Amino acid sequence: MKSLRIILLALCVCLAACMEWDYGLEEEFNASSEGLFICNEGNFQYGNATLSYYDPHSKTVQNEIFYRANAMKLGDVAQSMVIRDSIGWVVVNNSHVIFAIDIHTFKEVGRITNLTSPRYIHFLSDEKAYVTQIWDNRIFIVNPKRYEITGYIDIPNMTMDPPIHDQLGRHTEHPPLIL
């Protein structure tokens, strides 16, 4: 009986090792330049955030465009999105990532990782942006061209109240940041 269990366990392991994981098929898109993106936050800790696109010319909504274009899920809690120079920057809070996507094809062109819990991104130039985070007394400095963190600004007196994190440059004890 014991050897039968071992054989069954070994068989299950072998079968699982041979499985091919299907993440879905990638679709091709060519969106107009006048559409509207909708971040669907999803349920906290369920990894079911999605991105939708509304085309005002055809009056249609395309749901789950990130998944359909990239054959992978967006992640856990899509917090916000900013568009700069035909690149959409989708901030996914609980997945600790900011995805850069082409706004016409919805394909991922890059990502910024290793963030604590990002909420919003604000661009200063093509090579510098600030990222606010919840539960972190720092504003991260990132290089959008290289998709990397280049530094951070400590804000030691900043409280963990979410309204402070929701507005870049609105903290009354600190002057505007000029770097």
Task: Report each predicted region and the residues it spans.
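Predominantly soluble domains enriched in secretory-pathway, periplasmic, or organellar proteins
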Residues: 18-179
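Sec-dependent bacterial lipoprotein signal peptides
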Residues: 1-16
